[in-house]
Structures are given as structure tokens and as C-alpha cells.
Amino acid sequence: MIVQINDYFIGMIFKGNRLVRNTIPLREEEIFRFYNGKILDEPNKMCMKVGKIILKLYFADLDDKIARDLIDYELNVSSFTKKVLDEVKKIKFGETVSYGDIAKKLNTSPRAVGVALSKNPLPLIIPCHRVVAKNSLGGYSYGIEKKKFILEMEQIKKRLK
């Protein structure tokens, strides 16, 4: 399902009441490139609540640790991907860690970490955007400009705290 909040659209998939996949907030022309769902005319309260939390994460108005406490979610990923995502959850708001740093902790390669992060079903909620390459931003499923925007928003909000 796709929920519209203000000028943004957020794709979400639920299993019962648990969120299992979401997109980052996207403009209307972008949403269908990443998500082939139906825009809900009247989304239920749960969808709106989760959508608003994801929008706050996008604009760095909410810490992901708080969001994970507010959203009932389920990770359906391989055990390796789960280990990578568990490491990513430890990255503090406004900070970044390299693919190599995570790879060392898990005794694997930076490329394997990148592949696991590309399978993150809950972007922003699990902040894979905070993982960067040694000398660049690295990749991001929604494009490098989106990753740059999210990281810049977090830096601005961190300085204002």
C-alpha cells in the first residue's frame, strides 16, 4: 500500500500489524519506480502513524532508536543480513560508519556488507544510509542524492541539539 502524507508518498507492506517493508518518502513521480502498490484513499490509523514516523525519520526529526520502539516491525532476512542490520542499528544519529568497519566486526568483506544493506527492507528505520565507503558516500538503493540529503539533514539537526 502507498500512503500520501503532505507531498510525499511512502510504500509499506504489513504482515498483520507488523511492518515488513517500506520505502523512504518519495515524490509521486518517484514512488512507482520503487514500489508497485496502490495509493490508499483513506489509510487506516496504523498506516498513517507509521507513515508519519517514516517521514519524521526522513527529515531527521526523530531518532531511529525511538522509531523502532514506536513501530511493530518484523525482519524477514537471512541470518547474515540480520547480523549486518543489527550492527547498523548501533550507529548513532548524525554519525557514519564505513562498510569496512562493519565488515571487520563481522569478519567478512565490505562488499558482503554492501550486498546485505541493499536488502534492508526497512530503510530509515534501520539506518543503512549511515554506512559509507572509505572515500565516498558509497551506494544507496534510492540514489546517492537521497543518501546525501538524509545525512545532511541529520548533521543539521545534530548541530541544533
UniProtKB/Swiss-Prot annotation:
EC number of this enzyme: 2.1.1.63
Protein's GO biological process: DNA alkylation repair; methylation
Pfam families attached to this UniProt entry: DNA_binding_1 (PF01035), OGT_N (PF22413)
InterPro entries for the chain: MethylDNA_cys_MeTrfase_AS, MethylDNA_cys_MeTrfase_DNA-bd, MethylDNA_cys_MeTrfase_DNAb, MGMT, OGT_N, WH-like_DNA-bd_sf
Catalytic site: C128
Keyword match Oxidoreductase: no
Keyword Signal: no
Keywords carried by this UniProt record: Cytoplasm, DNA damage, DNA repair, Methyltransferase, Transferase
Reactions catalysed according to its record: a 6-O-methyl-2'-deoxyguanosine in DNA + L-cysteinyl-[protein] = S-methyl-L-cysteinyl-[protein] + a 2'-deoxyguanosine in DNA; a 4-O-methyl-thymidine in DNA + L-cysteinyl-[protein] = a thymidine in DNA + S-methyl-L-cysteinyl-[protein]
Location of the protein in the cell: Cytoplasm
GO cellular component, one term: cytoplasm
GO molecular function annotations of the record: methylated-DNA-[protein]-cysteine S-methyltransferase activity
Other observations noted: This enzyme catalyzes only one turnover and therefore is not strictly catalytic. According to one definition, an enzyme is a biocatalyst that acts repeatedly and over many reaction cycles.
Function (record text): Involved in the cellular defense against the biological effects of O6-methylguanine (O6-MeG) and O4-methylthymine (O4-MeT) in DNA. Repairs the methylated nucleobase in DNA by stoichiometrically transferring the methyl group to a cysteine residue in the enzyme. This is a suicide reaction: the enzyme is irreversibly inactivated.
Protein family according to the UniProt entry: Belongs to the MGMT family.
Listed name of the protein: Methylated-DNA--protein-cysteine methyltransferase
